[in-house]
Amino acid sequence: MARETFPFTSSMLRSLRLQQEWLEWEDRRRAAAQQCRSRRCPSSPRARLTRPHRSCRDPAVHQALFSGNLQQVQALFQDEEAANMIVETVSNQLAWSAEQGFWVLTPKTKQTAPLAIATARGYTDCARHLIRQGAELDARVGGRAALHEACARAQFDCVRLLLTFGAKANVLTEEGTTPLHLCTIPESLQCAKLLLEAGATVNLAAGESQETPLHVAAARGLEQHVALYLEHGADVGLRTSQGETALNTACAGAEGPGSCRRHQAAARRLLEAGADARAAGRKRHTPLHNACANGCGGLAELLLRYGARAEVPNGAGHTPMDCALQAVQDSPNWEPEVLFAALLDYGAQPVRPEMLKHCANFPRALEVLLNAYPCVPSCETWVEAVLPELWKEHEAFYSSALCMVNQPRQLQHLARLAVRARLGSRCRQGATRLPLPPLLRDYLLLRVEGCIQ
């Protein structure tokens, strides 16, 4: 007798196959759990079976996590599946619409993990509960792990909690950065210490940029971070994908008076550790070019003392003096005469007369530059750039400069230039060693007097 058969459709066969795979997965999971319980030890990460995490947009879940309500978190997250759910948030952001020709509100979905939310906001108790329920410590939902979020917000207690439970100190984001790269504010110093104690690699370069934590700290003027990384073996000679050393990034990040002081302190740490003051990036832009472009006279003088060359041009043919002249226009609220005098004392050549217009409205800086010439050049290039109210305020200086155009200077001034030429790039150091009265020494170093003689 022929055996009767039942015809299965392709969709039914697929459903049966999926059901069979699900049952096999459940059997393996239960067997692994039973084996774990029998050994009385937690299952290893390799033995843990993975399954797709479910997504959640429930406002109640969002409210509990983002507010740090421990009771609600305990009620909502009672097992491993809940602790590892993917939390989705949707926000409207402005985006340019080429078809409509104007900016429109576009919904953007962001994914993260409950543990990342709790640690980023410093909810230590909530984070501890999620970990005990089985939250994956190094899960990168939305590109970052919980340790990244905690370090970026300088949440010391949460960083310590994660590391205590076994989070990897060198876990990478999707872009290839470590938690140490995200210690970017002064308050994150203690977090950085915890990471290094837990085995974080201080010279690990990040993704395409190839920045190390030392580059990041130097770029933000974090002196204590720089000192910490140097103590743990950070290499001051490592370069980014653009050929920049940590000293380059420290000088490039110095913008504004307060920032200049912070970055100068970080640069000093690097120089004392052996950083090369002449190291240039791919565009031959040296740390001195960066310091001058940001108008940081103190930082520039520090670099010059450590061997930076004041006359070397970058890839565009601009010298540090050219960068300093441009900075006068971009950042007027500083004292450019200090920077100009330092560059001239360390071997910079007098500026081209046509460049004097950049500092025409800074009489003290203009005086320093004019005193670098044996004869005051034509004023046609800069006199028209002087503001009328500024001319009235400093009429004595501007009038004296006009009177000395193409006129012979005093013998004392010519003698000053002769001594400076003899000392060359060692002018500032040499002046302090000469047996001269303080007033004459200051005169040799282009002291501002308020008039041209």
From Swiss-Prot:
One of its GO terms (biological process) is protein ubiquitination. ANK repeats lie at residues 56-85, 110-139, 142-171, 175-204, 209-238, 242-279, 283-312. It comes from the Eukaryota. Disulfide bonds: none annotated. It holds the Pfam family Ank. InterPro entries: Ankyrin-SOCS_box_domain, Ankyrin_rpt, Ankyrin_rpt-contain_sf, SOCS_box, SOCS_box-like_dom_sf. Residues 398-450 form the SOCS box domain. CDD domains: SOCS_ASB_like. One of its GO terms (cellular component) is cytosol. Coiled coil: none annotated. Pathway: Protein modification; protein ubiquitination. Keywords: ANK repeat, Repeat, Ubl conjugation pathway. May be a substrate-recognition component of a SCF-like ECS (Elongin-Cullin-SOCS-box protein) E3 ubiquitin-protein ligase complex which mediates the ubiquitination and subsequent proteasomal degradation of target proteins. The SOCS box domain mediates the interaction with the Elongin BC complex, an adapter module in different E3 ubiquitin-protein ligase complexes. Belongs to the ankyrin SOCS box (ASB) family. This is Ankyrin repeat and SOCS box protein 16.
